[in-house]
């Protein structure tokens, strides 16, 4: 125990003998010429008689602050995991694309003209019937595309013939015969127009019956 105490006392004496040379050095300060300089730690320890014990910490003390910060930033960047090159999944992009697709689905298609739609119907009317249903000197009646006015499809009242008025032969003058001819022409024209319309409606109805049957069969299938 006495040997340990004497060794500690001798060590403290050596340290005490080393202190004055370190702190006796004064740094002149006049406000302008004062500046800090970096010094090699080994030279500093050797100059003051202190045995050098090089460690990782002592080596860092020799480096300027800027270099230390550079090393720290480099080490932190090296330690950080590399950024993935895969594109980041953005939920907002998915939502916007979904909304745009839904809007496209909701868009109503352009209306189709029913007159342009043709149904495959096996309908071949008699050419003679088509002639009877056509206006003389006009185009041949087409039961597939012909359209009637609303007035044409209304039920027509029954026309009663007027009672015949007996006219004596001595009263049948030129004026009488002229009026009678006009009435006969008008009556014939009315009968022909009525018969033409009836023929057209009949053939058109026959075609619509065929078309209706074909559509019902297609829907059922």
Swiss-Prot record:
Q: Which GO terms describe its biological process?
A: rhythmic process
Q: Region Leucine-zipper: what ranges?
A: 196-203
Q: Which GO terms describe its cellular component?
A: nucleus
- Outline the inducing conditions: Accumulates according to a robust circadian rhythm.
- Offer an example of a GO molecular function term for this protein: RNA polymerase II cis-regulatory region sequence-specific DNA binding
Lineage of source species: Eukaryota, Metazoa, Chordata, Craniata, Vertebrata
Specify the bZIP domain's residue ranges. 173-221
The molecule here is called Thyrotroph embryonic factor
Principal location listed in the UniProt entry: nucleus
NAD in keyword set: no
- Subcellular compartments: Nucleus
Q: Where is this region: Basic motif?
A: 175-195
What InterPro entries has UniProt attached to this entry? bZIP, bZIP_sf, PAR_bZIP
Mention any Pfam family matching this sequence: bZIP_2
Q: What is the documented function of this protein?
A: Transcription factor that binds to and transactivates the TSHB promoter. Binds to a minimal DNA-binding sequence 5'-[TC][AG][AG]TTA[TC][AG]-3'.
Show the segment(s) annotated as Disordered: 72-116
Superkingdom in the source lineage: Eukaryota
Biased composition, class Low complexity, residue ranges: 73-100
> Transmembrane stretches, by residue range?
none
